[in-house]
Regions:
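N-terminal helical cap/lid subdomain that shapes the substrate entry/recognition surface
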Residues: 17-106, 117-118, 129-132, 220
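Generic hydrophobic alpha-helical segments
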Residues: 62-66, 112, 152
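Proline-centered loop/turn at the N-terminus of a beta-strand
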Residues: 121-123, 204
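Anion (oxyanion) recognition and catalysis
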Residues: 116-117, 199
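Asp-based, Mg2+/Mn2+-dependent phosphohydrolase catalytic module
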Residues: 6-20, 129-130, 136-225
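Generic structural signal for small/hydrophobic residues in well-ordered secondary structure
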Residues: 25-28, 69, 124, 155, ...
């Protein structure tokens, strides 16, 4: 081994942080999205004030309510009808909502399964709603002939947990229910507030850029033996 190789090896050993758990955000980290397409789709339905309720990271009003699971889809459709002043077929609302989503590249689906084979525990922690997540289960996670639970050990979804990021309580509940130690856990998220909240609890974090290929990151976080 040359001196340069030895120095690189020492530097890698110092920098590497073994972890047991990897937690992925969904939108912007695994699945790409098109916010403008979603806004335009709702405007075509007559929902002209949609941009008051929807953004890439946190929602407001009744869009926040369906994301934190405090209203049912049926109640949510009725709220939209009242907002626009006329009835809209729920299927058309679903289509407009899910137009926000694009796809997960195959290499990222392969990455998730490979991480599990290497010995990591792989989780999802996402602010999402039942309509969008059911669409993803059918149209994204099944495209390789598998199911979503072939890619993750466990799912932590805001609408099921009745709480959303970046609130501290959702991270604490994830750690407790997933039996995770913060210092053995890496969160990959594209929201600065989410990363800051997780870091404050001692979780290792990585702020991902939209549609980033971050596979090389795991050299720095090898699986804990």
């Amino acid at each position: 081994m040359s001196l340069n190789d030895y120095l690189w090896f020492l530097n890698f050993k110092v920098m590497s942080i073994p972890v047991r758990n990897i937690v992925f955000d969904l939108g912007g980290v695994l699945i790409d999205y098109d916010l403008q397409r979603c806004l335009d789709s709702f405007r075509k339905l007559g929902f002209t004030q949609i941009d008051r309720y929807v953004n890439p990271y946190t929602q407001s009003g009744f869009f926040a309510q369906i994301e934190n699971g405090t209203v049912t889809p049926a109640q949510w459709y009725a709220m939209i009808d009242r907002e626009v002043g006329h009835h809209i077929d729920p299927q058309r609302i679903d289509e407009a909502l899910c137009s926000f989503l694009i796809d997960i590249p195959d290499y990222k689906l392969d990455m998730l399964r490979d991480l599990r084979r290497q010995g990591y525990r792989v989780f999802m922690l996402s602010n999402t709603n039942v309509i969008m997540f059911e669409w993803m289960k059918q149209h994204v996670f099944k495209k390789q002939g598998l199911t979503v639970l072939d890619y993750f050990d466990r799912l932590f979804l805001s609408y099921e947990m009745k709480m959303v990021k970046p609130n501290e309580e959702i991270f604490r509940k994830m750690l407790a229910d997933g039996e995770m130690v913060p210092t053995e856990t890496l969160l990959i998220d594209d929201g600065e507030a989410n990363v800051a909240a997780a870091s404050a609890l001692g979780i290792h974090t990585y702020l991902a850029h939209r549609a980033e290929d971050f596979r090389s990151l795991f050299h720095q976080y090898p699986p804990m033996k």
